[in-house]
């Protein structure tokens, strides 16, 4: 008879994402197989990477992933282990730890040691008693006591995973780093409160992912996927209007102190796509939200009530040059010339700028294990070198993301890249605000 896993489909997907898009195959279930260690080890020993899951009362799931083969007896060689806990009915409530451990197996008990002592012990013959030490309990944010009875124990084989301890550690700690970035962005305030909200202009060729980046930012803050901005794959720009999007924090509901300004896509033709003569007006804050672009007729300042002297709050404070990473090396000379012209306008206005490369496929390999810097492999890419040369921009301001497209749920590594890119844009904006001449800082009101 086929045994059905107690893990829900959503819980399986969360755990698979935790390990970098792995797949789970059920090997053992305590209610369907014998409650003894020998039966357990017979099912999962020498099966490769495994995940042992304990279903507890109060809708809590606790488990441990072991990268190496699970031994039949005492293992003196440390194993790469990731510990996790899930709270049912809370799809984002996952906590995880990365520990090097040793495994002891005998006829009555399964014990997993970490360097600080006993971490987990399982005794099926005593009614499947499970015990976790304080280190694991605190790290997994559990308050269950030291000895408790699991409702069910399941063991899964884990396939499609990279056999690399560093990669596993990176995947396991990604959620924690995502939380740190999110907290930092929630606490962000523009430099010396010169403006209440920083404005970031997204500019780039048609199909580069400008609107998709806004959708990705909004999704990451909301905690679920959303697609407010219309996106598409037409050869001409889907975005016809100038849009100023505010971002709300999904937790507090408050509007965050930054806006993303979406523009029409650039095209090679002189009377197609965003007219680059419109750029200075946008940068200076002379263009209202929902202004309809006309590629054949450059913008006139009369469209804005602040055209004579727009307040600082209406101006652009950072520009993000958005480029599809797979199209960078095939950009025409005309398109590169347009990007250089826009960069000159940005510099002349004293505005900070970054480059944002989208549609990165191996997005989990962009940042190093500490999530602090891009890897050397990434910074040496020809696309990065070309963008650096064209825009005369430091490597630190060349950012990479993989926008959400067809996914149905958020991924920590994608969110990390989105948050890291946004953080660098805000830093560039703050640098520009700090460098403003006194006469400009005096033109602040109205907020």
Curated annotation (Swiss-Prot):
Induction per the UniProt record: By respiratory syncytial virus/RSV. HA-28 antigen is expressed after induction by inflammatory cytokines.
Tissue: Expressed on cells of the hematopoietic lineage. Detected in transformed cell lines of the macrophage and B-cell lineage. Expressed in spleen and bone marrow.
UniProtKB keywords: Cytoplasm
Domain of life: Eukaryota
Compartments, record wording: Cytoplasm
GO biological process: cellular response to virus; immune response
Ranges for domain TLDc: 1-159
Gene disruption: observed consequences: Deletion mutants result in elevated respiratory syncycial virus/RSV infection in vitro.
GO-annotated cellular components: cytoplasm
Assembly: HA-28 antigen forms a complex with Kb MHC in BALB.B donor cells. Interacts with FKBP5; this interaction modulates IKBKB and IKBKE kinase activities.
Function in brief: Type I interferon-stimulated gene (ISG) that plays a critical role in antiviral and antibacterial activity. During bacterial infection, promotes macrophage differentiation and facilitates inflammatory cytokine secretion. Plays a role in the control of respiratory syncycial virus/RSV infection, reducing the ability of the virus to replicate. Acts as a feedback regulator of IFN responses by negatively regulating IKBKB kinase activity through interaction with FKBP5. Precursor of the histocompatibility antigen HA-28 in BALB.B mice. More generally, minor histocompatibility antigens refer to immunogenic peptide which, when complexed with MHC, can generate an immune response after recognition by specific T-cells. The peptides are derived from polymorphic intracellular proteins, which are cleaved by normal pathways of antigen processing. The binding of these peptides to MHC molecules and its expression on the cell surface can stimulate T-cell responses and thereby trigger graft rejection or graft-versus-host disease (GVHD).
Similarity section: Belongs to the IFI44 family.
Protein name per its UniProtKB record: Interferon-induced protein 44-like
Classification of source organism: Eukaryota, Metazoa, Chordata, Craniata, Vertebrata
Gene expressing this chain: Ifi44l
């Amino acid at each position: 008879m086929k045994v059905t896993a107690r893990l829900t489909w959503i819980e399986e997907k969360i755990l698979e994402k935790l390990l970098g898009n792995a797949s789970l195959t059920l090997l053992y279930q305590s209610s369907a197989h014998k409650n003894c260690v020998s039966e357990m080890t017979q099912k999962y020993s020498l099966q490769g990477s495994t995940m042992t899951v304990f279903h507890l009362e109060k809708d809590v799931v606790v488990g441990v992933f072991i990268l190496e083969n699970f031994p039949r007896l005492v293992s003196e060689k440390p194993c790469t282990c990731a510990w996790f806990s899930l709270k049912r009915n809370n799809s984002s409530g996952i906590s995880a730890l990365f520990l090097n451990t040793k495994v002891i197996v005998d006829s009555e008990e399964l014990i997993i040691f970490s360097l600080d002592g006993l971490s987990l012990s399982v005794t099926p013959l005593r009614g499947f008693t499970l015990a976790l030490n304080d280190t694991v309990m605190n790290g997994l944010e559990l308050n269950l006591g030291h000895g408790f009875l699991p409702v069910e124990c399941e063991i899964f084989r884990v396939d499609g995973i990279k056999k690399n301890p560093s990669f596993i550690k990176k995947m396991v700690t990604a959620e924690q780093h995502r939380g740190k970035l999110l907290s930092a962005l929630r606490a962000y305030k523009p430099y010396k409160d010169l403006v209440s909200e920083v404005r970031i202009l997204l500019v780039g060729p048609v199909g580069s992912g400008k609107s998709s980046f806004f959708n990705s930012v909004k999704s990451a803050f909301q905690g679920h996927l959303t697609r407010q901005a219309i996106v598409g794959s037409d050869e001409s720009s889907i975005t016809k209007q100038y849009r100023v999007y505010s971002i709300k924090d999904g937790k507090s509901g408050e509007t965050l102190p930054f806006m993303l300004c979406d523009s029409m896509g650039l095209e090679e033709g002189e009377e197609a796509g965003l007219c680059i003569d419109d750029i200075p007006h946008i940068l200076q804050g002379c263009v209202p939200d929902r202004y309809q672009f006309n590629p054949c007729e450059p913008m006139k300042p009369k469209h804005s009530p602040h055209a004579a002297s727009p307040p600082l709050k209406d101006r652009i404070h950072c520009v993000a040059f958005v480029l599809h990473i797979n199209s960078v090396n095939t950009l025409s000379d005309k398109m590169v010339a347009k990007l250089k012209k826009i960069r000159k306008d940005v510099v002349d206005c004293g505005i900070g700028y970054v480059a944002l490369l989208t549609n990165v496929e191996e997005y989990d390999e962009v940042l190093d294990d500490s999530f602090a810097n891009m890897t050397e492999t990434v910074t040496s890419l020809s696309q990065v070198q070309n963008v650096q040369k064209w825009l005369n921009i430091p490597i630190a301001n060349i950012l990479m993301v993989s926008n959400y497209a067809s996914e149905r749920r958020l991924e920590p590594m994608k969110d990390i890249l989105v948050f890291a890119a946004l953080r660098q844009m805000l830093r560039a904006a703050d640098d520009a605000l700090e460098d403003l001449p006194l006469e400009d800082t005096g033109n602040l009101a109205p907020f």
